[in-house]
């Protein structure tokens, strides 16, 4: 219902603009929706460099198993940077205590549980119709070493005039360097995540 909620918010706030952020499929779907509804000029649309989206069923049942055993989940992060950018910590909070979710993360990175469409994603390219793409700037220590931050560097790809406008609004708050698509190459800007050879076996066992 998020598209309708956004549209209703824009109708209720005719003098305001809105920032929509989502995965490539979500953001391009919203782009088409906003064009049909005639509100494209009031929204900035940003998508994320995406590894793929896991099965909602898998997370729902995994979370339910934790809550049934330990209590209600009140917080979730997959990228806590206490150990640095390259070794993120994933955990949930239950009753104020941190509980690791390593099993779920392992399945995610093993490429067993992504949605079938993710393995054929048409948005795994630098040519996108959103205003801007954001993501981790992996390997920046090799291409722009003097700008590397062990806590992480973000990558912005600007696609449209709206994207330029958005960047101009925020650039005063940023420390940034200009790059190019060769320097900032990321695997999921070129091709979708490959399906694991163990995917079918995983779901049969699940």
Predicted regions and their residues:
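Portal/gating segments that form or line small-molecule/metal binding sites
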Residues: 1-11
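A short alpha->loop->secondary-structure connector
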Residues: 35-48
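Short, acidic/turn-prone active-site loops that include or flank metal/cofactor-
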Residues: 1, 47-54
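Gly/Ser/Thr-rich loops at beta-strand to alpha-helix junctions
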Residues: 20-30, 52-54
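Short, solvent-exposed amphipathic alpha-helical segments in soluble enzyme
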Residues: 34-38, 62-64, 171-175
């Amino acid at each position: 219902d998020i598209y309708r909620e956004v549209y209703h918010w824009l109708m209720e706030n005719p003098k305001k603009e809105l920032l929509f952020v989502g995965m490539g499929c979500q953001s391009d779907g919203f782009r088409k929706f906003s064009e049909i509804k005639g509100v494209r000029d009031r929204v900035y649309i940003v998508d994320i460099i995406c590894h793929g989206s896991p099965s909602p069923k898998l997370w729902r049942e995994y979370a339910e198993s934790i809550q049934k055993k330990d209590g209600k989940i009140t917080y979730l992060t997959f990228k806590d940077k206490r150990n640095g950018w390259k070794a993120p910590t994933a955990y949930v909070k239950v009753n104020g205590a941190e509980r690791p979710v390593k099993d779920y993360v392992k399945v995610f990175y093993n490429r067993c549980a992504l949605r079938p469409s993710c393995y054929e994603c048409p948005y795994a390219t630098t040519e996108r119709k959103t205003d801007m793409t954001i993501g981790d700037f992996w390997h920046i220590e090799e291409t722009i070493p003097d700008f590397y931050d062990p806590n992480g560097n973000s990558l912005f790809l600007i696609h449209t005039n709206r994207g330029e406008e958005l960047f101009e609004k925020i650039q005063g708050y940023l420390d940034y360097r200009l790059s190019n698509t060769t320097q900032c190459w990321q695997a999921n800007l070129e091709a979708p995540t490959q399906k694991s050879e163990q995917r079918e076996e995983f779901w049969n066992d699940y």
